[in-house]
Amino acid sequence: MANILRKTKLYFKTPDTKLSYNISSIMQGVLMDKVSYGFGEKMHQNGIKPYSQYFSYEDDVPVWTINTLNEEAESELVQPLLDEGCQKIYLRQKNLTLEILKKEHQEVSYDALMQDTFFSSCSRYITLKFKTPTSFKTNNQYQFYPTTEHILKSLVNKFNACGFDAELDYFEDMEEALQHMQIVNYSLHSTQFYLEHTKIPSFMGRITLKIAGPQQFVNLMHLLIHIGEYAGIGIKTAMGMGAVEITERKEK
C-alpha cells in the first residue's frame, strides 16, 4: 500500500475567549478520546507518533491542523472529525465548545513527494517558518534554538518512523551530511510552551538553510523537510509543538 501523508484543517468560529497554541495539548486529549483502546495504548508508549497536530490562527480565524503519517492514524484520529455529524468540538478542561465553520482535507503520496523533490532539481535555499514553539532535547536538556544537527537528526528520525520503503544512505555519516548544511539567515525569538504544569523553553520564527553538496543531496533534504510539514520538527509534535511551514526561494 502506498504511503499517504494527509493534512486536515478544522476552521472554528472565533470564541469569546482568546485561545493560543498552548490549547494544542487539550486538543490532543480530544483526539485520544475518540480512538480505539489498542491504538490509544500504542500512542502512550514512548517513541515518535504517526501524527502531529497544532492550533493556530489564519487571518484571525482559529484553525486546528491534524497531520497523519499512516492509514491507521488517519482512520483513528481524523475520520471521526470528518464525519458530517461532527460540527462542534467540546474542550472539557476549558468548558468551551468550538463551532466548526469548515473542514479542509488534502493528501499527498510519498511517490508524488519523491517526484516533486528527490527526482526534481530543487533550490539550494529553503526557508522554514516555525509556526508553534519548537524545541529539541539532548542529554535530558532542552535545546531551544535551532542547529542544523538537531534539525537534520529530527527529520531523519521522523522519516524512519513513517515506515517508508527507503533507506537514507546519505546519513550513514551524519558529520559529512552536516558539512553541506548552513543556516544563513534567521529571525527567531525565545518563548515557552505550557504543557500541564511544565514550561518547555522553545523558539519560534524563521530560518533559511543553504544546502551545498551534490544536487541529489539537495533534493533529498527538500524531501525530508517537506515531510517535516506533516511530521513536525523537534519534540512533542503530537502535543502541538514543532509545526513547520516551508517557503522556498530561488538560488542566487
How would you name each of these model-derived features?
Residues 1-252:
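RNA-interacting cores
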